[in-house]
Amino acid sequence: MSMTPKLALQRLIDHTDFTHEEMLDVMQQIMGGAFTTVQIAGFLAGLRVKGETVTEIAAAAQVMRALSSKVEVEDSSYLVDTCGTGGAPTKAFNVSTASAFVAAGAGARIAKHGGRAASSKSGSADVLEALGVNIGLTPEQVARCVNEAGIGFMFAPNHHAAMKYAAPVRRELGVRTMFNLLGPMTNPAGAKRQVMGVFDRDLVSLLAHTLKKLGSEHVMVVHSADGMDEISFSADTYVAELKHGEVNEYTLNPAQFDMPLHEIDSIHVENAQQSSEIILGVLSGARGPARDIVLLNAGAAIYVSGIAGDLQDGIAQAAHSLDSGAALHKLQQLKALSQAA
């Protein structure tokens, strides 16, 4: 029996979880325009109140993946994404975007997925534009960037046309919904390795197990005690790491890596331009808090890529990427390739 909007909403009122097949059915209908905007809003709000399960998120991600415009790169086996959920209350600069260039400079192949700011001061698309990168590329042009420069950016709206029915509802609702979780799980290039920052500690284990169900290979899902959706330089970071088919949960602290503690305020920005200036400074060799948090997060990306044996090794390789100028060169390459497209 097809999961009609009325039946789906009744299931949520009854606090009943959906099976994998039921969630596939509902998502296909939402993405196909069968639900009205009011029904989509009711479904998303009800699902949030009930609480999303691994099965439900995985099924929804499968539908979004199937409907997305793919980026066909030459070898996707060791591709890394640093896309997070967004939604953290901090005003930090775009750490994951800076980390992507540093990881690429160390030899990791980066296929970064992202969009514009929703609740933050600057989304990855916003800061990349401020850095001079053309984000309006076709899937084929993004693939060329990854193949030739080792890094490419996939602007989410260009790859998820089926979101046209749900996107306006998300904006109007103004609260976090399941779609905040799906962005990092629907990489159009099929990256199976990623560092995913999340806005809530309760999501760390949930999303790591969801990515396991979706076939990811090496993933670190992170959230810090100070509220950051990054590996923090000021507090403990909660981690769920998927590797070799197993999820292990643990805590990281900057002291483990001989990192000094910093105040979060030291990396706050008000807009994409300020964020781009900090990133350019870090890539150009500037020392200080911004560099330290980038080292931690780029080190994680290098580690999950498979070219570092552990996080400590990844951090060391990240430092070399910055100090050698390799990370800055990756930004220059991506700018040139994207602008020439």
UniProtKB/Swiss-Prot annotation:
Gene3D superfamilies for this protein: Nucleoside phosphorylase/phosphoribosyltransferase catalytic domain (3.40.1030.10), Transferase, Pyrimidine Nucleoside Phosphorylase, Chain C (1.20.970.10)
Residues annotated for Mg(2+) 1 binding in this entry: S96, E230
One Gene Ontology term, aspect cellular component: cytosol
GO molecular function, one term: anthranilate phosphoribosyltransferase activity
Enzyme Commission number(s) of this protein: 2.4.2.18
Family: Belongs to the anthranilate phosphoribosyltransferase family.
Name this polypeptide is given: Anthranilate phosphoribosyltransferase
Organism of this sequence: Methylobacillus flagellatus (strain ATCC 51484 / DSM 6875 / VKM B-1610 / KT)
Gene field: trpD
